[in-house]
Every structure is written in C-alpha cells, then in structure tokens.
Curated annotation (Swiss-Prot):
Pfam families per record: Kre28 (PF17097)
Single Gene Ontology BP annotation: homologous chromosome orientation in meiotic metaphase I
Name of the protein this chain belongs to: Outer kinetochore KNL1 complex subunit KRE28
SUBUNIT field: Component of the KNL1/SPC105 complex composed of SPC105 and KRE28. Part of the ten-subunit outer kinetochore KMN network that includes the KNL1, MIS12 and NDC80 complexes.
Cellular localisation: Nucleus; Chromosome, Centromere, Kinetochore
Segments forming a coiled coil: 124-153, 208-234
InterPro entries given in the database record: Kre28
Keywords assigned by UniProt, alphabetized: Centromere, Chromosome, Coiled coil, Kinetochore, Nucleus
Source lineage: Eukaryota, Fungi, Dikarya, Ascomycota, Saccharomycotina
Cellular component terms (Gene Ontology): kinetochore; Knl1/Spc105 complex; nucleus
Family indicated by similarity: Belongs to the KRE28 family.
Keyword Cytoplasm: no
C-alpha cells in the first residue's frame, strides 16, 4: 500500500529502530551484569566450601534457580567476602598466637628490650602504613559503590526514556493511521508532499496561526456588522415615525457620489494596482488587494495604527519580511494617499 506521507513513515521507522537498538543494549548489559554477579556469588561459595571443612556441602550451585534482586545478591556476596576474610584472620591468629613448646623456649631467650623495640616498630608500621592503606581501600570502595549506584540510576533512566519513546512512537503510528484513513475517505483532499517533514509541519503551523488571526479579524467584522444591523433594524422599525430630512438625503447622496468618485477617478487612475477596495467606517478599517496580497489597515483619528498582510501563495516568513519593510517606510508618513502609494509600489516590486 502506497502511503501519502512516506517521509513521516520513514522518520518514525528510523526512530523506532534506534529506540529498539538502545533498549536491547541496556537489557543485554543488565543480563551480563546479573550473570557476572551470580558467577561471582557461586565461586565465593565454592571457595568457602573447599577451604573450610565445617561446611557440609558438595559445593554445587545452580544460579539460574536463584530468583533474587541484583542488589540483594550483591549484598550477600559482600557479606560472604567479609566472612571469608574474618575466617582467614582467625585462622592466621590461631596459627601464630597458640605457642608450641619450641616457640615458648625461643621466646624465653628473647631480650625483652629488643622485643619491645620490635613491638614499637610493628605498631608504628601498622598505624602509619596499614591504617593509610585501609583508608585508601575504604575510599576506593566508596567510589566504586557510588559509581555503581550512578550507573544503575543512569541505566534505569535510559530504560524509562526508551519506554516513553516507545509509547510516543506507538502514538505516532496511530496518528499516521488516522491521517491515512482520513485521506482515503476524502480523496479530493490535496496531498502536500515535501522532502522535509519538519519544515512542512512548521510551515503548516505558521499558516494555522495566520488563518486564526484572519478568523479573529472576520469575527470582529461580523460583530460590527451585527451591531450595524441591529441599529438599522431599530431605525427601520420606527421608519413610519420618522420624517426624512431633505438635508439628510442630500448628505447621503453626496457621500455616495464622493465615494464613487474616489473609487473610479482617484483609486483606479492613480493607484490602478489596488483592487476590491472596501471601507469600514465604524471599525476604522481599510481593506484592499494588491496582486496576490491582501492588505488590512487600521485607522484611528486619522493615524494608521496597524497594517496586516495575508496571502496563501507566500510563506509566513516572506509575508513578515514584507510587512516589516512596509512599516519601516510608512513610519513617519501622515498622508493616507502616500501610504497607499508606498504599500502598493513595494508589494508590486517585491512579488
């Protein structure tokens, strides 16, 4: 089946492959660490059994039957190591501390002062070297423990991130399926293709913002028209009670003639590029078109407050650039006619 948005499918498949690869690496590393810990645990037990006869065991252990958390296994391994060291220390102590007859005879011949000197040297060696080495060992053990905890925490975070990414990818697949179903149900919909899906999405988002702004403008015009309609309805409802003033008729006729004269003589002759000119006196807006560009001007007390540009054939960034250049050119301009000339000429020369 041919997909309308094959580039989106390719991107999602690429991300899915990367997340799957990272997840497999994390799981393999955890299995390797678990197997290494179980092997060390088994070897420690075998060493204890072979060294000490007090353990009545054949020394066989199947790590696969052990179903314990990795942290507890590590704690047990450390405890077994500590017991092993303590037993070795006791063995060495008993071996050298319990004297034989020959040892007692030799000790009786020792010079007490020499013995005290040797004892002082041993104490000094123990206090200086052994204690220092013990501190270094404890420091290294602490560093190893800290790094192990950090690695475990990082591994857990990576697993959580992979899980969240997998859920997001599943959501992407669902959205793509919904999009395909919608486009299959609406074959007349124009398919937008691009080599860069990120740019296409960004550009569509900008156009949505532009369309939303235009919708707000149209809603404002609708509110104004409704208010005008309500006022006209009130006037027409009382039409029988009103007497038409000849002066009012003359003023209205003059306004209509002046408006037609302005459109036909001034605008069409002096500014032929302007089309579909519309004036909204109540809202103070002036709307017209120049080529593919639609221009809306907000005028208050004879001062131009804002200029908005719309076009479905130009990109959002291009429209914003033209708008900024126009605002810079009319910033200190007070004549409405000159402003129209500047806007018209710049748009015509830019397109």
């Amino acid at each position: 089946m041919t997909h309308y948005h094959s580039e989106y499918y390719s991107e999602v498949e690429k991300f899915e492959y990367q997340v799957t690869h990272v997840t497999e690496q994390i799981l393999q590393e955890q299995d390797r660490l678990r197997g290494s810990t179980l092997h060390e645990y088994n070897q420690t037990i075998l060493q204890l059994v072979s060294d000490y006869e007090m353990f009545n065991s054949n020394g066989q252990c199947d790590p696969s039957e052990i179903n314990l958390p990795l942290e507890k296994l590590e704690s047990w391994t450390n405890s077994l190591k500590q017991i092993h060291l303590e037993l070795e220390s006791i063995d060495n102590f008993l071996r050298y501390a319990i004297p034989s007859d020959q040892t007692i005879l030799n000790l009786s011949k020792f010079n007490e002062s020499k013995y005290e000197t040797l004892q002082a040297e041993v104490s000094e060696l123990r206090d200086i070297n052994v204690v220092q080495l013990q501190k270094e060992i404890e420091s290294l053990q602490q560093q190893i423990t800290t790094k192990s905890d950090e690695n475990l925490l990082i591994s857990e975070k990576i697993k959580e991130s992979c899980l969240e990414a997998s859920q997001d990818i599943d959501q992407c697949w669902k959205l793509l399926e919904q999009l395909e179903a919608y486009e299959n149900a609406n074959p007349s919909t124009e398919v937008i293709t691009t080599t860069d899906p990120a740019f296409s999405t960004y550009n569509q988002w900008k156009w949505n913002q532009l369309a939303e702004s235009e919708l707000k403008h149209i809603n404002q015009q609708l509110i104004t028209l409704r208010a005008t309609k309500e006022k006209l309805d009130k006037v027409f409802s009382k039409r029988s009670e009103l007497e038409t003033s000849p002066k009012s008729i003359e003023t209205f006729t003059s306004y209509q003639l002046l408006s037609q004269l302005w459109r036909s003589k001034f605008i069409r002759q002096l500014l032929p590029d302007i089309a579909n000119l519309e004036v909204y006196p109540q809202s103070g807006k002036l709307k017209f078109e120049v080529g593919i560009m639609q221009v809306i001007m907000q005028i208050e007390s004879g001062i131009i407050k804002s200029v908005s540009l719309f076009s479905y054939e130009l990109s959002y960034d291009r429209i914003e650039t033209i708008k900024e250049d126009i605002l810079g050119r009319i910033e200190h301009q007070k004549s409405l006619f000159k402003v129209l000339v500047v806007i018209t000429d710049y748009i015509v020369n830019s397109l």
